Amino acid sequence: MEEYKAVEEAAMKFVKSVTEGDSRYAKELFIDQAVLFGYLDGQLEHGSIEQFYKNVDSVGADAGFRARVDVVAVEETLAVVRVLEENWGGRIDFTDYLLLLKMDGQWRCVAKAYNQNSDTIQKQK
């Protein structure tokens, strides 16, 4: 149970960054080589986690944002976390999956994949 709590606490850095619109907390969670994959408003985003940092910092905080962290699985050095996000940027709902590895005694995120709920997509013009 201790490891589940440690994984949850690590994932909360992700939530805190999105809540406050400040990527500095997420930068403590993600390794520099972390990758992301998912669709934002119908456009595929993939590549460096830097894109996530830019999105968080440019959208900023929203008082209506809510999130829930579910620790799906924990093994000795591997964990999977689901994060449900509501009202990011005042309009978007996401389901994120974070893949964490225990590195040098700390849970660090190596990959983020996400789905934007279809009823919150704004197509690019």
Segments and roles (model prediction):
Residues F30-Q33, L40, K102:
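Generic secondary-structure microfeatures
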Residues Y4-V7, K13-F14, T77-A79, L99, ...:
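Generic alpha-helical hydrophobic packing signal
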Residues E2-A6, V35-D93:
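Surface-exposed, charged secondary-structure patches
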Residues M1-R24, E28-D32, G47, T120-K125:
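Short, low-complexity N-terminal intrinsically disordered segments enriched in polar/charged residues
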Residues T95-K123:
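Short beta-strand edge/turn micro-motifs at domain boundaries
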Residues K27-E28, F37-Y39, V110:
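Short, hydrophobic secondary-structure boundary micro-motifs
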Residues F30, E85-N87, A113-Y114:
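Short beta-strand segments enriched in hydrophobic/aromatic residues
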Residues R24, E28, Q43-L44, A73, ...:
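Flexible domain-boundary/linker segments
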